[in-house]
Amino acid sequence: MRFAPQLEQGRLLIRYKRFLADIETDSGELLTIHCPNTGSMLNCMMPGGRVWFSRSSDPKRKLPGTWEISETPQGRLACINTGRANTLVEEALRAGVISELEGFTTLKREVAYGQEKSRVDFRLEYPDGYLYLEVKSVTLGFDDSSVAAFPDAVTQRGARHLRELATLAREGVRAVLLYCVNLTGIDAVRPAKEIDPVYAAALREAIDAGVQILAYGVHLTPDEIVIDRRLQVHWLD
């Protein structure tokens, strides 16, 4: 996926009210832009840090742009726009990059399912069956470590999705959770038990129920982002 229009660069001043960020562009322009991320963004919102944003040409839009990429304190690039993850995964699925899920004949997005009335990111249909696929965008990294972690904030919604997937797996339905690690310089991902122990416990229960866990990393520059490799998944028991 190439970023279009071309991203512009600036420096972060402050993120506030969750969905807003003040930045200064390289040309000295002061802007308030949309922050498309509900997490804590622990290592992605350092004041003074480099950011890249897409500028909107829609005159009716209240904010002039959307925050897309941050440079982390570790010097990595992180795509903080969580809305990109599902598009990236769909591109990778259709290109056959995610080999574990190859062979589907139909792909459906945002399908209602489960006892808790959730919506799963993808339903893939095969000649001999189907599966449900939930995607999580990962941007949390640490100093001197190539292992990313999820989540970066307590996520009741994430735990609910795991419960739904676990229920499906117990019923004999193939259920898959895929971590899309939108952070450069990463080789593996793990549950952030120190941030959300409830989510970590739900993940262990989902694995025990038969939910398949996958993780894939990206090639990311200010010009493009694409899923390009499988990553390891580390557990904290």
Swiss-Prot record:
It comes from the Bacteria. InterPro entries: SfsA (IPR005224), SfsA_C (IPR040452), SfsA_N (IPR041465). Signal peptide: none annotated. CDD domains: SfsA-like_bacterial (cd22359). Transmembrane segments: none annotated. Belongs to the SfsA family. HAMAP family: SfsA. This is Sugar fermentation stimulation protein homolog. It comes from Pseudomonas savastanoi pv. phaseolicola (strain 1448A / Race 6) (Pseudomonas syringae pv. phaseolicola (strain 1448A / Race 6)).
